[in-house]
Amino acid sequence: MRREERQQHARETTRRAILDAALELFIADGYTQVSIRNIAAKVEYSPGAIYSYFPSKDEIFFALAEEGFHLLSGPDDPGRREYLRSLEPVDRIREMFWHVYEFSREQPQYFALMFVDRYVPRISREYERFAFVRDMKHELIARIQECIDAGDFPSTLDAPVACRMLIMGVLGVAAMQLSDRLGPPEQADVLARDVLNTLLCGLKSGVSLQSRDTLCAVDEAASRATVS
C-alpha cells in the first residue's frame, strides 16, 4: 500500500471511529447533552482533532443521518426491484412501507437518531445533500398514485396524505417498540403488520380523510430555494 493510500485509509478509519462514538453517545445521552469534547474523550482524541474532520457537532449528525437514510433506501438491488415489480400495486406499497419498519429493527440506533430524537438538527438545513430523501418520499407517493389510477384506491384519495398516514403508522409502532413500550419483539411485529394492513384496508374502503397534504422539511426547503 502506497503512502497516500495508507494515509487515506487511516483518515477513513478515524472518521468512522468518530461517527460510531458520536452515534453511541447521541443515543445514550441525547443529542443536546453531547459535546465535541465528549466525543473526543470517547475516541481518545483531542477536540481539535475532531474538528479537523467535522467542523461542528451538527455536521457529525448530518453525516450520520445521511448514512442512515442511505441504509433505509438500501442498495440498488435489481433483484429487489424485479420482486417489487412482480407484486400487485397494493402489495407493492405494503412491502415498501414494511421495509421502513424493518429498518427500525435492523438499524435501531440510526432509526432513533433519525426519527425519535426531536432535538437533532433539521435535515432541511442541508436540503441539497438530502435531496435523495425527498426522492424516496416521492417514490412512495408515486406507487400510491398507481393504486389510485388502477382503481385499487378511490380517485378522491390524496396520495401524499395517504403516504403520510402510512409512514406515521409504521413509524409509530417502531418508536414504541424501540422505547420498550410494547411487549416482546414478536408482538411489535404483529402490531406493525396489523397497523399497516388496517390502514391499507381503510384507504381502499374510501374512508373520508380530513388530513391535508403538507410539505415535509426537505420539500419545504427545496421549494424556498426554487423561489429564491
For the regions a language model picked out, list residue spans one by one.
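Helical hydrophobic small-molecule/effector-binding pocket
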Residues: G74, R94-V116, R134, H138, ...
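Amphipathic alpha-helical packing segments from all-alpha helical-bundle domains
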Residues: H70, D76-D77, S124-A150, P160-R164, ...
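Amphipathic alpha-helical segments used for helix-helix packing
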Residues: R105-S124, A175-S179, L215
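N-terminal intrinsically disordered/low-complexity leader segments
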Residues: M1-T13, V207-S228
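Hydrophobic alpha-helical connector segments
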Residues: P78-Q109, A159, C163-L166, D189
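Conserved hydrophobic residue
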Residues: Y31-T32, F153-P154, L182-G183
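Helix-turn-helix
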Residues: T13, A17, A21, L25-E59, ...
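Hydrophobic alpha-helical segments that form the core
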Residues: Y101, L157-L178, Q187-L199, A217-A221
